[in-house]
């Protein structure tokens, strides 16, 4: 339920040092983007502006002018995010190319 609450509260992305497996899976399944990047978490402070590219895994701290590398999302996860969740992704046929 935590990813649902965060998404409903308007949080656009969570970057953390690590996630419990259940939180990670639930987040992806509802189309809530999360990334693991210890260095970005250590440097980020309140009111820092961050920019994330999920296709490359690049996290930019605009405030500090620094870049960090997290693991990029594979295409099927990007499709889940674009469709705002796994259920919508299946309904829209967006995973068909990965199911063959």
Curated annotation (Swiss-Prot):
It catalyses: (2R,3S)-3-isopropylmalate = (2S)-2-isopropylmalate. Pfam families: Aconitase_C. Gene3D superfamilies: Aconitase, domain 4. Pathway: Amino-acid biosynthesis; L-leucine biosynthesis; L-leucine from 3-methyl-2-oxobutanoate: step 2/4. Keywords: Amino-acid biosynthesis, Branched-chain amino acid biosynthesis, Leucine biosynthesis, Lyase. SUPFAM superfamilies: LeuD/IlvD-like. Heterodimer of LeuC and LeuD. Catalyzes the isomerization between 2-isopropylmalate and 3-isopropylmalate, via the formation of 2-isopropylmaleate. This is 3-isopropylmalate dehydratase small subunit. It comes from Clostridium pasteurianum.
